[in-house]
Amino acid sequence: MPKIKCLLKVEDPPNFLVLHCGGNNIPGDKGEKSVDLRLKINNTLVSFAKLLPDTVLVWSQILPCQHWRGGVDHEATDMVRKRLNSFVATALIRTGGKYIRYPEIQIDCPHLFAPDGVHLSELGNQFFLYRLQQGLQTFITKPTEKVSPKLGELGPWLCYD
């Protein structure tokens, strides 16, 4: 928040602010409960909305990992990730925000992840950047759209003639 306050002294507020969080803070290693993390995220969203009332907040989905750091229960942690994404998407859309999904990035696609199973591979990063760009372009050209891509919408690499 301090960085944004500083930038607002010399720049106009942005039209869009993309919020992309990694999964490192998903509970597991410090005993924090997922409800506590949701509360922190919600408080941050409220603060951003007050600070930037004319800026559209965009939630960029927390991506899955093949291996979560700290040796936590993978299935439980992934469920927390999905619930966090759903919670934030619902909260933002309700208040005029937007949501970007990454449907191609799935844990059962090992070629999309680096050998550590946490970070994206070059190909995974390309999918990520494509969907991020597509989402922003959609929200700029179609202001009433709230989610990108739509469920079932294929990327151009999956379209066949």
Regions found by a protein language model. Give the residues of each.
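Alpha-helical cap/lid subdomain in secreted, periplasmic
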Residues: 3-161
